[in-house]
Amino acid sequence: MSNSIFSKIANAVGGKKGRLITLAIWILLVIALQLFLPKAADYKDDAAPDLAASEPSVVAQKVMDEQFPSGEGTPALITWYRSTGLTNADLAQIQQFSKELEQNPIKHQKTAVPYDKMPLPVLKQQVSEDGTTFIQTVLMDSSATSDQLKDSFTELEKTANATFSDKPFKQDVASKDTLVARTTGPAGISVDATELFSDADVSLLIGTVLLVLVFLLVIYRSPILALIPLIAVGFAYLAVTPILGLLGQEGIITYGSQGLSIMTVLLFGAGTDYCLFLIARFRSQLHHDENRYTAFKKAFGNTAGAIALSGFTVMAALLILLVAKYGSIHNFAVPFSLSILIMMISSLTLVPALLGIFGRISFWPFVPRTEAMAKEHATKKGKKVKIHRENRFWHRVGEISAHHPIKTFVITLLILGGCALFATQVKYTYDTLSTFPKDMPSREGFTLISDHFGAGQLAPMNLIVKTNGEKTAMRENLQKTDGIETVSVGVPSTKNRDYTMYTIQLTDNPYSNAAMDLIPDIRDTAQTTMSDAGLSKNNVWIAGQTATQYDSRAVTKDDEALIIPLVIGLIALLLLAYLRSITAMVYLVATVLLSFFSALGLGWVIIHYIMGTEAIAGLIPIYAFVFIVALGEDYNIFMISSIWKKSRELPLREAIAEGVGQTGGVITSAGLILAGTFAVLTTLPIQLLVQFGLITAIGVLLDTFIVRPFLVPAITMLFGKWAFWPGKGHNQEHK
């Protein structure tokens, strides 16, 4: 896009007339969107399936629901515990509570085991061996949302409070000789997961706004300027959320609380960056031009192209998530890319309008002036003239990289490579419970079950086979499989007796990798048993949480294998189109990839060795990769484009020093703010977001302080004129 076009855009959005019109359009647009479109929060769907209907565990669940309707429903496991042992009075009250649930079911309750009809000796047989724990099963409607289940469990606790005098759901698990109750199982876990993200939204928004405000005040020391990016981001947020609400209402897209939380961070982090690139250039230009509109035109012309390319790069990379088969990843694509698009438009229209309105006053009390204006101002005030001097720190950093490229390259490569080596040691988990705080009710309930019964009892899996009435050695063969605790007697379907279901309890945590690794063995055993009986081995289905987690792991790994090359390819093509250099495209992509693996490795050191976490969430690599690579390439684009422009008039060595010097301050500020916004995620009680925020923040910081000022300039210097190949946008002297 030519400078004349940028000049026209600058006039249209930031000129004397255009600035007020642009601001008015934004205000009217946001008001209209807020008044006439639904809120995004009203149409978030935290119960949206992550797996496609064709996945084996989903097919198995459908077969189970059709053939064994009595088992249809989401289990809520009410765990009763007394450290000194459950008393007869406790069990009698549990029976009374069971009777209450049977006579007055809570909302969305399907069935509840009638423990009140069991003789006390029979009931005692279901208590744990140490006599401390009892599990009461209530099946909830599988179509109920997490919010509906939350209301149901609130009602359940009220019923319990009327039955038990000491309010067992409110008691601390560590209490001595006190009856304690917790709701866990798939239903309880679902409710806690949703509540965690719901509680995170407000605190995340407030924390992010405060952090960005503090950073801006420290960097620019101007209250007006600190508010301009926040206003731009705020308007973008108010515009994007109702649009998402409309798309959700119409069923065009699906999104959840997790996506909205990360979108908030993305808007404030990336959005503030885009604003800063323009603001910093505008401030610099005001030291050379008396007319603020002339200064703005030049600043806009020098940054708008890079901002637009940066925005489109991130947006396109995020849209690639649409190819993901795993629901949570796929559902990020539209909210994230739409937020970046609107934020980019805001930074190129609303920010110029605000700068046009406030002009130099934007930077009060440290107003940038030309030398002549500074002398005139000092004379009026009777003060000594303060001539503006550019900060030379980043220029000196650029000189180090340009004058000592080999040393710089080797040192930075050793630092980043050393961190990246730890990425090979990372262990992953797909255990939903491990992402919860230890004091969450469902996790406390699971811990009680695991400690006193066995982890496998939390979520047994179900094996369904179609035997056509033939006898098989299924139960006997399954019991021989390592990792299986118990296998129930086969239960024929009440709808079609050709179908038989076996309930399998594992020795391991059903959400663990060890449990998931058993799925192929169980399937092979079942299929072999069917074949030995002369039956089709295709009529074998495995349902349950472990089977679902197994499919989730497989699908996310497939998504990683597809999305990562696509993102790399896309960014490479965009860089090639913008820089017209194959060489630069290759080493810029390579450096950002190195940033990602270094961040993953260093993040693992902190998470595993310092925080004591055994494994990180399995979704972290793909989450962090897209953000670190896409956002990290932003800084390379801004810096390398500056070097490219300087190299047309200066020798490459000087162009590198000038390019790093010119962009160093603003990129550092932007990097700190972006890393800070992602670091806000580490304050949340959700390990998935803590780990994602930490690793992404590390990646941004590595890119800001090592890759961009040292590694990339050093590589550019080492390549010399070949850094531009096959383009020729450089001076003939490269010394």
Task: Show which residues each predicted segment covers.
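Short, contiguous strand/loop micro-motifs
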Residues: 47-48, 85, 328, 383-385, ...
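Acidic/histidine-rich, surface-exposed loop or edge segments in extracytoplasmic proteins
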Residues: 76-81
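Membrane-embedded transmembrane helical bundles of large multi-pass transporters/channels
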Residues: 1-42, 148-426, 547-735
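N-terminal cofactor/phosphate-binding cores enriched in small/glycine residues
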Residues: 27-29, 39, 45, 50-53, ...
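Structured non-transmembrane domains adjacent to transmembrane bundles in polytopic membrane proteins
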Residues: 54-72, 84-179, 425-615
